[in-house]
């Protein structure tokens, strides 16, 4: 199943795919807790909310067994010129990357259900997030072998 998911992710257009065991990020939770208690988050009070969900995907989506992480490069050759404020490259597109990635994830999910059946993929699989859940995304990318 792992190889199928990774291969289908690439065929769907993602640049990479990794899979990590869903479990509490205990070291990250301890660090984040002390970081928050020290006030390092300044005015970003939203970081205080959903603490357990941020550090444990099973709390966010019960019965989760794995976290599938996909990467999509949004680099563009387009250079900004002149004395103007810089805009992040992900914002150069006329299409919102959230919409693009969500659509690609739906195709990937459909391929998995088609191959393995809906009874193998429980309803918790259908939870796809694109910057829309309180997850430590970089840590999950690292755990899935896609980051450092």
Task: State where each predicted segment sits.
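Auxiliary alpha/beta "docking" domains used to position bulky ligands
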Residues: 1-148
